[in-house]
Amino acid sequence: MIVEEIQGNIANLSNSEKQKHVEKVYLENSDLVKRIQRVVTDHGTEIGIRLKQPIDLQYGDILYADDHNMIVVDVNSEDLLVIQPRTLQEMGDIAHQLGNRHLPAQFTETEMLVQYDYLVEDLLKSLGIPYVREDRKVNKAFRHIGHSHD
């Protein structure tokens, strides 16, 4: 089977639609940005992914669906630093520092997530910014944004 487009996301399905039999494709965070790849579901089904559009995969994306079954993307957990700034000043300070290092980050209402790096952990300790090291799933890929200093 070759998948060329995403059928939707399980987050947008009705409760009755979520009752279908689900096979999962477990991906590493770095694989979410790959438009072309071969994967195997947790039931052993081989799938080729060749997305027509240049979009990243996300947790819950439906790769295939029929009346009874669906194949859904799941994301393996990852070693993260979960940064929990107490003030806007702390958020600005750490965001500036991480931006200078070109580190991709993700945000929730109260947290900043970065992939584990011992240098970042040392920086957080030295600045006194609260954080925890945690194994956690993220919904989207950590993506580097290119730019120049010209």
From Swiss-Prot:
It is found in: Cytoplasm. GO terms for cellular component: cytoplasm. One of its GO terms (molecular function) is unfolded protein binding. One of its GO terms (biological process) is urea metabolic process. The keyword Cytoplasm applies. CDD domains: UreE (cd00571). Involved in urease metallocenter assembly. Binds nickel. Probably functions as a nickel donor during metallocenter assembly. Belongs to the UreE family. This is Urease accessory protein UreE. The lineage of its organism: Bacteria, Bacillati, Bacillota, Bacilli, Bacillales. The gene is ureE.
